[in-house]
Amino acid sequence: MAKILVHVTNGPENPTRAALAFLVAKSAIDEGHSVSMFLAGDAVQLMRKAVLDNLAGLGTGELRAHFDAIVSGGGRFYLSGMSSKGRGVSEEDLRSIPAEFAMPEVLVRLSLEHDRMFTY
């Protein structure tokens, strides 16, 4: 199966697009693909528990349900270190999440290692 990278820059200010990115990632896992997600800009805030537990998109579902399915399916999360620092997202926010902070060169490397890339 394919390796899919989903690059997300929309955060809580655009819940429908944010949830859509996670729905697409979940759908790829459901189809048997390997998925990585790179969150940058406002999207890094999606990893906060309060946001995960409460965000729902119009017609794109609940963020928590999609997130849990991605984690269960072996998905990996990368958060822009600079975006996270600027928005106060810390190691504590990522404590129980399969995620790591990453710099732009990691996004470039991931884009080359994956077969397809979706951007939201």
Please tell me what each predicted stretch does.
Residues 54-81:
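A glycine-rich helix N-cap at a beta->alpha junction
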Residues 25, 35-40, 77-81:
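Short internal beta-strands
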Residues 18-31, 37:
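Histidine-anchored nucleotide/phosphate-binding helix
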Residues 29, 71, 111-112:
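Anion (oxyanion) recognition and catalysis
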Residues 43-57:
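N-terminal beta-loop-helix "entrance" segment that forms/cooperates
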Residues 5-19, 51:
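Short, glycine-rich nucleotide/cofactor-binding loops
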Residues 86-119:
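C-terminal structural segments of small proteins and small subunits
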Residues 53-58, 94-98:
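Short, flexible loop segments at the rims of nucleotide/cofactor-binding pockets, characterized by
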